[in-house]
């Protein structure tokens, strides 16, 4: 569960427009736009093992003593080593892709020290128990952004899809009441499950009678719906010079592809 946050700090962050919404324990992504943060005493958690998926158990904790600590399977694996450097410390990511631990609103005590062009970035607690920063944004779905169900979730759902992954017909991603599904007719659909009719927020409008569709994300950040083994039904048509990217179903109901991987605690290869 998430630990209590500093209410005065939260009010200040909201007042100065530095925070879109506070995260919950089952979140594991921080965004530069709309901006989110990991607040004092909060924990992000990634654990799909209760669903018989061998990813997790990973946690990222912004400790009250100002140290940002990463745990994997109960063991400490990485930290900013900023214990005692301030009060009310919190983690954000800026529009250049740099992760920053700050105290008292705007005094930095730690930086990731990797930057890129101005854009939209995502800071991820990854499936392998490491941290990664991706961006800038390459592509986003055309639907309007909105807020998800404010009720906290008690289980981790996977809402990030990485390069080199392939998924067949069925549920692809899920964040609270938003669900990305590849239907049996090969239409990739983003649904709001809070409505009686499961309103469609976005779709590829694709169809195939073969019922053998799958989606894949290329290293260069291009998303595909394919069938008949490799024939393309739909593509996002946006690419970048990248060897690894990530598709994220955000809390505002937008699908966004970020790439390349700008920074990580441990390279994948």
Residue spans for each PLM region:
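Beta-rich ligand-binding surfaces for carbohydrates and other polyanions
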Residues: 2-269
């Amino acid at each position: 569960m998430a630990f209590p946050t500093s209410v005065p700090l939260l009010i200040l962050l909201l007042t100065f427009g530095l925070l879109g919404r506070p995260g919950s324990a089952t979140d594991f992504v921080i965004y530069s736009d709309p901006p989110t943060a990991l607040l004092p005493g909060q924990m992000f958690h990634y654990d799909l093992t209760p669903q018989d998926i061998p990813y997790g158990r990973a946690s990222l904790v912004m400790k009250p003593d100002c140290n940002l600590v990463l745990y994997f399977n109960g063991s400490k694996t990485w930290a900013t080593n900023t214990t005692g450097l301030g009060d009310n410390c919190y983690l954000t990511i800026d529009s250049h892709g740099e992760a920053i631990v700050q105290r008292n609103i705007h005094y930095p005590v730690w930086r990731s020290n990797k930057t890129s062009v101005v854009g939209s970035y995502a800071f991820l607690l990854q499936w392998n128990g490491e941290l990664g920063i991706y961006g800038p944004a390459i592509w986003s779905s055309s639907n309007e952004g909105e807020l998800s169900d404010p009720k906290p979730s008690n289980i981790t759902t996977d809402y990030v899809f990485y390069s080199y992954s392939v998924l067949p017909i069925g549920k692809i991603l899920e964040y609270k009441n938003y669900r990305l599904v590849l239907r049996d007719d090969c239409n990739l659909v983003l649904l709001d499950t809070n409505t009686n009719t499961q309103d469609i927020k976005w779709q590829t409008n694709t169809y195939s009678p073969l019922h053998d569709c799958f989606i894949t994300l290329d290293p260069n950040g291009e998303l595909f719906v394919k069938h008949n083994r490799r024939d393309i039904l739909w593509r996002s048509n946006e690419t970048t010079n990248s060897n690894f990217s990530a598709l994220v179903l955000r809390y505002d109901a937008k699908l966004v592809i970020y790439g390349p991987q700008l920074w990580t605690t441990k390279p994948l290869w």
